[in-house]
Structures are given as C-alpha cells and as structure tokens.
C-alpha cells in the first residue's frame, strides 16, 4: 500500500497495477493474512488480501460465475452436496445456491475476519447466502477439514488465494492435496479451482492443469478477462469435461438447473471461455511440470 490512496499490486517482479483508492472501509492483520476492504475509484468496493485484489464490485460476477457454473452444469446429475474451500466474500456460495437441486453447501474458510467483513460490507457479493438454511459455514483450515471429514460431495470448488510462497494456500495446489479431494468426491463428481493468470503466470496455470489431469484423468481449462485483475484469469476443472458442452446444452441446463439470474455466463460465453488461443494451447504441449508437496508451484509475485 502506498499511503492511503493507492494500492500498488505487483503482477510480476517487474510490473504492478496501480489502483486509486477512494477510502478504506476496514482493515486488519489477522493471524493468517492482511485483509483490507476498500472503495476503488474505478472498480467500486473491493477485497484485498496480502496486497492482492481478490474481487471487486465491478466484475466479481464474471469470476464467480465462470468458477462455479461450468463445473456444476457438466455433472451428470444435478448436484445435491457442494463443498467450497475459501470464497470468504460469499459470492461463490451465492452462485452454488442458485441450483434447485442443492440440499447442502458446506463452505470452509480459515479466516473468520474475512467472513465478518463480508457480512458487514459485501452484501452485493453474498446477497444473504450466509443465512440460507442449506449453508453450513465452517471456520477452519481447508487441509485440516479435508483430512478429517467423513462426508462425500458431488462437487468441490476451490476459491483460494494464489499459491504464493509462505502463504496459507500454496499447498492446496499440489498433487497430494488433489488426491485427498478425489477421496471425498462422490462417483462422477468433479472439482474446480481458480488457476491464476495466463497473462502473468502462464506456467502456473498450465501446471495446475497438469496436476489436476494427473489425479483426475479428465481435465479442462477456461479463461476470461478480468479488468480488476489487469489481465486474463484462468480456471481448471477435474473429473468432468465442461469443454465438451455445446452452447445449446449449456443454455438448456441453465434453464433446467438454475433458479436465478446470471449476468455473464451463458452458452456463448461458455464457448468463448473454453476456446483457448493458439499461443496458450501451445504451452500445454511444452510445460510438463506437476505441482507436489516437495516441489510446489508458486506465482511469480
């Protein structure tokens, strides 16, 4: 943070995105991370964790709809039980609860302060999802929860902070962690994770894909442009193949499975998001790294 007026968000060791801040709504250094809620001049309200923009009012719906819906629509049967790791703003939960079939949505977040801030300041994100009777909010470490849970889920959504060295999240992008997730998935279930930026950390994006494909055998990758992130943003899905859904299938399943409005995602945007450009697709042939506990992947900044 530069004074109280600018956030200088480093994208790589060589470049940053400067965000003008109108005012700081709340700020606290918790035992896990530095959490700040602000009003950006361009993007409106926004959540910052450890100097990284997590989401803004301007375009959070793009990120959260592309994170959630390709996974849940590509499941053979409409999902009944969904596990969310991270997603403290409540927007991922909001999208999950739009499914008529969902009976239980378990959301696990390590930092109670993020939830507290979200409930107070980010209603536009959660829209009351924390109070939905289908919601089970658990404040604990995600890895600890996965090791101890006895339940199985139709879908698991990883809305985590980036794999930054010495952070709370980087071990949640490894082969060993994905193997633990596979054990608590119901048959024909699937997972999705945010997969960082093809613009600034293409090797990380591809490595996450490689790692998920190694564990789940089936995998696909999507991307979209996020203005508040200053570039492309990626998502990787495992155990399912949303990339094989046609435009018409997506639109039909939205009508069948979802109760509520979507602002970004439909059959057309689905097709575009899974149509990776040639320069990115070529890297999937070149990069073979798998992220493991002994050799994890990190974003460059």
UniProtKB/Swiss-Prot annotation:
UniProt domain PABS: residue ranges: 4-240
Positions bound to S-methyl-5'-thioadenosine = 33, 109, 141-142
* Broad class of where this protein is predominantly found: cytoplasm
Q: Which reaction(s) does the protein catalyse, per the Swiss-Prot or TrEMBL entry? A: S-adenosyl 3-(methylsulfanyl)propylamine + putrescine = S-methyl-5'-thioadenosine + spermidine + H(+); S-adenosyl 3-(methylsulfanyl)propylamine + propane-1,3-diamine = norspermidine + S-methyl-5'-thioadenosine + H(+); norspermidine + S-adenosyl 3-(methylsulfanyl)propylamine = norspermine + S-methyl-5'-thioadenosine + H(+); S-adenosyl 3-(methylsulfanyl)propylamine + spermidine = thermospermine + S-methyl-5'-thioadenosine + H(+)
Thermal behaviour (record text): Optimum temperature is 90 degrees Celsius. No loss of activity is observable even after exposure of the purified enzyme to 100 degrees Celsius for 1 hour. At 60 and 110 degrees Celsius the reaction rate is one-half of the maximal value, and a residual 20% activity is still observable at 120 degrees Celsius.
**Keywords from the named record:** Cytoplasm, Polyamine biosynthesis, Spermidine biosynthesis, Transferase
Superkingdom in the source lineage: Archaea
Which pathway does it take part in?
Amine and polyamine biosynthesis; spermidine biosynthesis; spermidine from putrescine: step 1/1
Q: Which GO terms describe its molecular function?
A: spermidine synthase activity; sym-norspermidine synthase activity; thermospermine synthase activity
pH note: Optimum pH is 7.5 with one-half of the maximal activity at pH 6 and 9.5.
Which EC class is the enzyme in? Answer: transferase
EC number(s) in its UniProt entry? Answer: 2.5.1.23, 2.5.1.126, 2.5.1.16, 2.5.1.79
Q: Where in the cell is it found?
A: Cytoplasm
Query: Per its UniProt record, what CDD domains does this chain match?
Result: AdoMet_MTases
Annotated binding of spermidine, by residue: 64, 89
Position of the signal peptide? none
Q: How is its activity regulated?
A: Competitively inhibited by 5-methylthioadenosine, 5-methylthiotubercidin, S-adenosyl(5)-3-thiopropylamine and S-adenosyl-3-thio-l,8-diaminooctane.
Xref: PROSITE patterns: PABS_1, PABS_2
Which GO cellular component terms are attached?
cytoplasm
Q: So where's the catalytic machinery, residue-wise?
A: 159
- Which PANTHER family does the entry mention? THERMOSPERMINE SYNTHASE ACAULIS5 (PTHR43317:SF1)
> In UniProt terms, what function does this protein have?
Involved in the biosynthesis of polyamines which are thought to support the growth of thermophilic microorganisms under high-temperature conditions. It seems that long-chain and branched-chain of polyamines effectively stabilize DNA and RNA, respectively. Catalyzes the irreversible transfer of a propylamine group from the amino donor S-adenosylmethioninamine (decarboxy-AdoMet) to various amine acceptors such as putrescine (1,4-diaminobutane), 1,3-diaminopropane, sym-norspermidine and spermidine.
Q: How does it assemble?
A: Homotrimer.
What protein name is recorded for this chain? Polyamine aminopropyltransferase
């Amino acid at each position: 943070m530069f004074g109280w007026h600018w956030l200088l968000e480093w994208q790589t060791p060589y470049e940053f995105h400067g965000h003008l801040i109108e005012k700081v709504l709340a700020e606290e250094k918790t035992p896990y991370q530095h959490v700040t809620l602000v009003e950006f001049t361009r993007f409106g309200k926004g959540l910052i964790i450890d100097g990284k923009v997590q989401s803004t009012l301007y375009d959070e719906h793009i990120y959260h709809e592309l994170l959630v819906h390709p996974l849940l629509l590509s499941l053979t049967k409409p999902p009944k039980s969904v596990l969310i790791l991270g997603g403290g703003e409540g927007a991922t939960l909001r999208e999950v609860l739009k499914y008529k079939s969902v009976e239980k949505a378990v959301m696990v977040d390590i930092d109670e302060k993020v939830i507290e801030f979200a409930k107070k300041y980010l209603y536009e994100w959660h829209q009351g999802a924390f109070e939905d009777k289908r919601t089970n909010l658990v404040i604990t470490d995600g890895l600890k929860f996965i090791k101890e849970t006895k339940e199985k889920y139709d879908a698991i959504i990883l809305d985590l902070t980036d794999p930054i060295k010495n952070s709370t999240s980087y071990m949640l992008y490894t082969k060993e962690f994905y193997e633990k997730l596979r054990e608590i998935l119901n048959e024909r279930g699937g997972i999705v994770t945010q997969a960082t930026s093809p613009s600034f950390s293409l090797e990380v994006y591809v490595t996450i894909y490689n790692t998920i494909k190694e564990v789940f055998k089936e995998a696909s990758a999507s991307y979209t442009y996020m203005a508040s992130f200053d570039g492309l943003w990626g998502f990787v899905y495992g155990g399912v193949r949303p990339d094989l859904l046609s435009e018409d299938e997506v639109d039909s399943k939205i009508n069948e499975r979802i109760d509520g409005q979507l602002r970004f995602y439909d059959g057309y945007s689905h097709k575009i998001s899974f149509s990776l450009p040639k320069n990115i697709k070529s890297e999937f042939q070149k990069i073979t790294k798998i992220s493991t506990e002994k050799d994890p992947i990190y974003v460059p900044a």
